[in-house]
């Protein structure tokens, strides 16, 4: 993890300034939706591009992620089995040449879902393992037991507003600096919030090449997330999490783009179970289509290290950008 983040930092140090048309530096606004991790203030995947001066960007995304993990040690038991649907509204406003402000408002639902059978078939088609998916289909059970004491349990469908995030960004030489504060507006008992305020800070860079006479953009970022004293498994929660990511996007035609991105983050909990205590490496692949002022995007996310990332995820999102 340290070596990978160091490589991202090296990339940032030699990045070019963001191009004027931020459409070519777009990314899928993915983040980890592991039920025990999505409550914290990790920003969604972003690039160095800002809204145009005096303009704004509005985005809406729908994420559906599915988990089927369990573990047991001499003194602990963990179960993560269910489906999470997250609908997020994102607004960015360029209020000054050197300042962009933003807000992200999520709505989160945890349920048994309907995708277990489809995911088993998907994994079989790709030659991936289904060894974690030998339990009943479409059930909800998120639980953590330590020394015979149930520290957390959720086994019925819940939903509600998640933790709202306020953000600011500014250009800094060849880079973009982004900071965010996540507020405790969700409910820890429903896993729609952590019950604490988190603060993040990241450095973002991008550069653009030409491939087959079309723009090929590379983006990367590295940052740190400071966690407040949350109410979900507080005995095990860490206070600091590093994160980073890289993305490649090719404008294949005037309206159609292809992209892939890799996001990484450190562990949030000191526990024997990598399912909530391990590092996260998530791969996202997909495409986007420009229809007037709207950019429509579809992405599929898969875990790379089979630990703290959701087992399967897909996202449909749309972005509207307006200049002054």
Question: How would you label these PLM feature ranges?
Answer:
Residues 318-324:
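Short beta-strand-to-coil "C-cap" segments at the C-terminal boundary of structured domains/repeats
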Residues 196, 235-239:
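Active-site glycine- and acidic-residue-rich loops that bind
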Residues 20-192, 199-228, 241-253, 257-300, ...:
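Transmembrane beta-barrel domains of Gram-negative outer membranes and organellar outer membranes
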Residues 1-29, 324:
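Cleavable N-terminal export/targeting peptides
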């Amino acid at each position: 993890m340290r070596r990978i983040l160091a490589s991202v930092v090296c990339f940032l140090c030699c990045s070019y300034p963001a191009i004027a048309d931020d459409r070519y530096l777009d990314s899928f606004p993915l983040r980890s939706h592991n039920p025990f991790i999505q409550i914290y203030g990790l920003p969604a995947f972003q690039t160095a591009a800002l809204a145009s001066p005096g303009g704004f960007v509005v985005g809406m995304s729908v994420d559906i992620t599915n988990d089927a993990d369990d573990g047991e040690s001499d003194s602990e038991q963990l179960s993560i089995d269910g489906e999470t649907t997250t609908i997020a509204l994102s607004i960015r406003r360029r209020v000054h040449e050197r300042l962009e402000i933003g807000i992200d408002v999520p709505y989160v639902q945890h349920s048994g879902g309907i995708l277990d059978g489809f995911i088993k078939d998907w994994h079989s088609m790709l030659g991936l393992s289904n060894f974690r998916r030998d339990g009943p289909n479409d059930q909800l059970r998120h639980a953590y037991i330590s020394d015979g004491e149930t520290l957390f349990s959720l086994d019925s469908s819940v939903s509600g507003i998640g933790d709202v995030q306020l953000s600011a960004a500014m250009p800094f030489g060849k880079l973009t600096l982004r900071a965010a504060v996540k507020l405790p507006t969700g409910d820890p008992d429903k896993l729609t919030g952590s019950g604490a305020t988190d603060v993040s800070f990241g450095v973002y860079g991008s550069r653009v090449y030409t491939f087959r006479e079309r723009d090929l953009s590379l983006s990367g970022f590295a940052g740190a997330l400071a966690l407040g004293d949350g109410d979900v498994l507080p005995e095990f929660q860490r206070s600091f999490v590093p994160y980073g990511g890289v993305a490649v996007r090719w404008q294949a035609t005037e309206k159609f783009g292809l992209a892939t991105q890799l996001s990484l983050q450190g562990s949030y909990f000191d526990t024997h179970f990598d399912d909530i205590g391990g590092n996260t490496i998530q791969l996202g692949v997909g495409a986007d289509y420009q229809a007037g002022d709207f950019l429509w995007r579809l992405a599929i996310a898969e875990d790379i290290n089979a630990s703290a990332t959701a087992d399967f995820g897909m996202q449909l999102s749309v972005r509207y950008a307006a200049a002054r």
